[in-house]
Amino acid sequence: MPITPQEALQRTIEHREIFHDEMVGLMRQIMRGEVSDMMVAAILTGLRVKKETIGEIAGAATVMREFSRRVDVSDHQHMVDIVGTGGDGSHTFNISTCAMFVAAAGGAKVAKHGNRSVSSKSGSADALEALGAVIELQPEQVADALAQTGIGFMYAPLHHPSMKVVAPVRREMGVRTIFNILGPLTNPAGSPNILMGVFHPDLVGIQARVLQELGAERALVVWGRDGMDELSLGAGTLVGELRDGQVREYEVHPEDFGIAMSASRNLKVADAAQSRAMLLRVLDNVPGPALDIVALNAGAALYVAGLAGSIADGVLRARAVLADGSARARLDAYVAYTHQLAGQP
C-alpha cells in the first residue's frame, strides 16, 4: 500500500523510517503537485529533524531522476560529474568548475550538473556565464558539447522542470531540506562516476552508500575538516569511496600529495568577477593555493573516472595539463562551442 502524506508525516514525528518504495510513491505525489504546500513543508521539516536515511534519500533521488529531462549519452566510459551540495558557506572561487576543464583536458568526459550560487559567491552556472559560456542548452546540445569538447554542463532548472512545484515551499522555508542533497545525486546524463563534496561530515558515508544503492560505479564523497565541500588544503578531508561495489571511508591530507597546507581564506572571492579572475589564473598555471586545490580536486576526478591509478597520480596528470596549456585551451574550446550550438556569435 502506498503511504499517504499524513502517514509519512506521522512517521517522521515518531522518528521512524519511510521505506524506500514508500518514499518513491510519496515523492511522485509531491513532484506531480498532488501534495499541499503545507504538507510538503511539514514532511520536509520532519525528515530534516529525524535525519534522512539512506533508503529515503535513494528513493527520493530515484524519483527526481524519473522526472528529469535526460541527456542521452551513448558512451559513459571515463565520464565523471564534479559536484557539491553547496551550503558550506566558504565563499571560495568556483573550484569544481575550474577542475572540470582540467579533468577534461586530462581525458575525462565531464558531465557537470549545476546551478546558480548557493554557498559560494559564484555557483557553477554563474562562473560559466562570467567566462562567456552559454549555459542554457537543451539536452541534445549538452550531449553534443560533451561529445565534441569533453564537457557538458547541465543547468539544473532546465533539466528538473518539476522542481518548480516545490520551489516556493523551499524558498519560504529558507532552511536546508532533503532537496539540497538530492541535486548532486540526479545527474541527467547518468554519469556513473562522481566526485561529490558535501556540507556535513555525516553525509560522507551516507551519500557514498546512497550512490551505491543507486548503481553508481565509482564515487568519492568528500568533506574538508575546515568545512569545505571539496578536497581541502586547509585541513584533512574525510572521504567515502565507492569502488568495486564496496564503500570505504578514510581521511587524506594535502601533504599526502606533496601539496602545502593553506587556509581557505586564501581562496575567498567577493563576486563572480573575482571568481573568474582567480579561475583564469589557475588555468594560466599561476602557482599558488588556488592552483594546488584545483590540481588536487581535478586529480581526484581523474582517479574516479578511471584515468589515474590513484589520487596522487591524478594530481600529477592535472598539473601536466595545466602546465602545457591544454586545460586553458579546453575552456576556450568549450565556450566557443556553446556559442556555436546556441547560434550566437
UniProtKB/Swiss-Prot annotation:
<dbReference type="GO" id="GO:0000287">
    <property type="term" value="F:magnesium ion binding"/>
</dbReference>
<dbReference type="GO" id="GO:0004048">
    <property type="term" value="F:anthranilate phosphoribosyltransferase activity"/>
</dbReference>
<protein>
    <recommendedName>
        <fullName>Anthranilate phosphoribosyltransferase</fullName>
        <ecNumber>2.4.2.18</ecNumber>
    </recommendedName>
</protein>
<keyword id="KW-0057">Aromatic amino acid biosynthesis</keyword>
<feature type="binding site">
    <location>
        <begin position="94"/>
        <end position="97"/>
    </location>
    <ligand>
        <name>5-phospho-alpha-D-ribose 1-diphosphate</name>
    </ligand>
</feature>
<comment type="similarity">
    <text>Belongs to the anthranilate phosphoribosyltransferase family.</text>
</comment>
<feature type="binding site">
    <location>
        <position position="84"/>
    </location>
    <ligand>
        <name>5-phospho-alpha-D-ribose 1-diphosphate</name>
    </ligand>
</feature>
<feature type="binding site">
    <location>
        <position position="92"/>
    </location>
    <ligand>
        <name>5-phospho-alpha-D-ribose 1-diphosphate</name>
    </ligand>
</feature>
<feature type="binding site">
    <location>
        <position position="84"/>
    </location>
    <ligand>
        <name>anthranilate 1</name>
    </ligand>
</feature>
<dbReference type="GO" id="GO:0005829">
    <property type="term" value="C:cytosol"/>
</dbReference>
<keyword id="KW-0460">Magnesium</keyword>
<dbReference type="InterPro" id="IPR035902">
    <property type="entry name" value="Nuc_phospho_transferase"/>
</dbReference>
<dbReference type="InterPro" id="IPR005940">
    <property type="entry name" value="Anthranilate_Pribosyl_Tfrase"/>
</dbReference>
<feature type="binding site">
    <location>
        <position position="115"/>
    </location>
    <ligand>
        <name>anthranilate 1</name>
    </ligand>
</feature>
<feature type="binding site">
    <location>
        <position position="230"/>
    </location>
    <ligand>
        <name>Mg(2+) 1</name>
    </ligand>
</feature>
<comment type="function">
    <text>Catalyzes the transfer of the phosphoribosyl group of 5-phosphorylribose-1-pyrophosphate (PRPP) to anthranilate to yield N-(5'-phosphoribosyl)-anthranilate (PRA).</text>
</comment>
<keyword id="KW-0479">Metal-binding</keyword>
<dbReference type="GO" id="GO:0000162">
    <property type="term" value="P:L-tryptophan biosynthetic process"/>
</dbReference>
<keyword id="KW-0328">Glycosyltransferase</keyword>
<feature type="binding site">
    <location>
        <position position="229"/>
    </location>
    <ligand>
        <name>Mg(2+) 2</name>
    </ligand>
</feature>
<comment type="subunit">
    <text>Homodimer.</text>
</comment>
<keyword id="KW-0808">Transferase</keyword>
<dbReference type="InterPro" id="IPR036320">
    <property type="entry name" value="Glycosyl_Trfase_fam3_N_dom_sf"/>
</dbReference>
<keyword id="KW-0028">Amino-acid biosynthesis</keyword>
<feature type="binding site">
    <location>
        <position position="124"/>
    </location>
    <ligand>
        <name>5-phospho-alpha-D-ribose 1-diphosphate</name>
    </ligand>
</feature>
<feature type="binding site">
    <location>
        <begin position="87"/>
        <end position="88"/>
    </location>
    <ligand>
        <name>5-phospho-alpha-D-ribose 1-diphosphate</name>
    </ligand>
</feature>
<dbReference type="Pfam" id="PF02885">
    <property type="entry name" value="Glycos_trans_3N"/>
</dbReference>
<dbReference type="Pfam" id="PF00591">
    <property type="entry name" value="Glycos_transf_3"/>
</dbReference>
<feature type="binding site">
    <location>
        <position position="230"/>
    </location>
    <ligand>
        <name>Mg(2+) 2</name>
    </ligand>
</feature>
<dbReference type="InterPro" id="IPR017459">
    <property type="entry name" value="Glycosyl_Trfase_fam3_N_dom"/>
</dbReference>
<feature type="binding site">
    <location>
        <position position="96"/>
    </location>
    <ligand>
        <name>Mg(2+) 1</name>
    </ligand>
</feature>
<feature type="binding site">
    <location>
        <begin position="112"/>
        <end position="120"/>
    </location>
    <ligand>
        <name>5-phospho-alpha-D-ribose 1-diphosphate</name>
    </ligand>
</feature>
<keyword id="KW-0822">Tryptophan biosynthesis</keyword>
<comment type="pathway">
    <text>Amino-acid biosynthesis; L-tryptophan biosynthesis; L-tryptophan from chorismate: step 2/5.</text>
</comment>
<dbReference type="InterPro" id="IPR000312">
    <property type="entry name" value="Glycosyl_Trfase_fam3"/>
</dbReference>
<feature type="binding site">
    <location>
        <position position="170"/>
    </location>
    <ligand>
        <name>anthranilate 2</name>
    </ligand>
</feature>
